[in-house]
From Swiss-Prot:
The modification Aspartic acid 1-amide is found at D65. It comes from the Eukaryota. This is Alpha-conotoxin Lp1.4. One of its GO terms (molecular function) is acetylcholine receptor inhibitor activity. Residues 1-21 form the signal peptide. InterPro entries: Conotoxin_a-typ. Belongs to the conotoxin A superfamily. Disulfide bonds join C50-C56, C51-C64.
Length: 68
């Protein structure tokens, strides 16, 4: 292979690596956002459950804000 062909092959490999890396990052960001949203919902459910029990809400007044 000539020097020109090797340069073209190198650029194609770099381009392919960049495209794969970019799409992988976007997919990972979407998965992280979904996991974060699910965790937030689970935490909210746990706090609501705690606030409905007098003993738990008494220990965690900063979370329950006086509601039961």
């Amino acid at each position: 292979m000539g020097m020109r062909m090797m340069s073209i092959m190198f650029m194609l490999v770099v381009l392919a690596t960049t495209v794969v890396s970019f799409t992988s990052d976007r997919a990972l960001d979407a998965m992280n956002a979904a996991a974060s949203k699910k965790a937030s919902r689970l935490i909210a459910l746990a706090v609501r459950g705690c606030c409905s029990h007098p003993a738990c809400s008494g220990n965690h007044q900063e979370l329950c804000d006086g509601r039961r």
